[in-house]
Amino acid sequence: MGIVIIIAVTLGACTNGDLPTKESKDSLVEKKVEPVSETSDVEIGESGSDDTDILIAYFSWSGNTKQLAGMIQEQTGGELFEIEPETPYTDDINELSGISLQEQRDNIRPALISVLEDISQYEVIFIGYPNWWNNMPMPVFTFLEEYDFSGKTVIPFTTYGNGVWGKSVNSIQEMLPESVILDGLAIQEHELQNAPSKVSEWLKELGMI
């Protein structure tokens, strides 16, 4: 597979993290937006081949990352897997701000609802998440620690209000030293309407389609 990297990830761009303020709560989580299309609002198990070697795992609070995961699935035929904590997060962004920050400070690993039966069948694994507090939400840390990613090609994608990647790519590299980590795709919340073409260009450059 010929791989061309098209996105340069700038690590540590936000030295103070994506800290929410009274004026800008979107720095913690994505704003909830209308689906780009009916097909982009994909339910788990709705599409994808059972014999695919591509997995698209994602965590989504507002629905934005879910939409982006659906776009990737539509173009790659990969299997979707939602990373869901056993205890759902509140819809109140003020409460969520405090909860998610405390989880990060305490290095919590929230228990997840679903389990992959066999990750060995996948050669390429996309990992999607919003930027929370300059890093991945803690359920994504749980997911990455529960499976053996040795020898896998891992490709991150993120949705964000501010801060883009934060420290998340560094975290993935540290957690998965035996994996090949390719540069990913970052989509700001207001760019979701134009994301399908960006996803297509990105996947073509990576040699995925």
Describe the role of every protein-language-model region:
Residues 15, 19-123, 127, 134-136, ...:
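N-terminal beta1-alpha1-beta2 submodule of the flavodoxin-like/Rossmannoid cofactor-binding fold
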Residues 1-6:
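Sec-dependent N-terminal signal peptides
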